[in-house]
UniProtKB/Swiss-Prot annotation:
Organism classification: Bacteria, Pseudomonadati, Chlamydiota, Chlamydiia, Chlamydiales
Name this protein carries in UniProt: V-type ATP synthase subunit D
InterPro entries referenced in this protein's UniProt entry, alphabetically: V_ATPase_D (IPR002699)
Pfam families: ATP-synt_D
Gene Ontology BP, a term: proton motive force-driven plasma membrane ATP synthesis
Amino acid sequence: MSSQIKLTKNSYRAEKQKLNMLGMYLPTLKLKKALLQAEVQSAIRLAAESTATNEQARDRMYAFAELFSIPLYTDAVEQCFSVDILEKDVENIAGVEVPLLKRVVLTSPEYSLLDTPIWLDSLLASVKEYVVSKIYAENAQERLLLLEEELRRVSIRVNLFEKKLIPTTSQTLKKIAIFLSDRSITDVGQMKMAKKKIQQHKE
């Protein structure tokens, strides 16, 4: 309200149109906010589950910690930390593009089954499980952050519409309407006075 308001019929029509557009757009924003809130809750659960899975895989891998330092098997273990294939796509959720992890393939180290202890398979499997689960957990966290950021942005816009734009526009309309109504009454009064003077002059 600090800026100058043009108290004209054109301004009234423009503000009326603006208010109608705000009123039409607000439900769409509120719907998007509700959808994002649901998606964020789902993403929170997925991120928590992925993190828990990764932590469990880490604990299983740490059970073999003493074996990691055996020089004979170090190369095989290190190869399990290398990613051969990482297939990612983009998924649109409530208008937000988030990363979709489709497939993770790690390097399969070559070693002689006859010349290695039976526990090596379990060791390498635990390493692979940890690496893959960590990648999925990081992807889930990235999705969550993107959805939370969009929810924050949409929430700000909803608040802007509800608490500033719509009330301010409504107040402006009311002010213009009162001014135009008062001016109309004044104009009518002036016209009556003018007619009366003309009539008196004729007499």
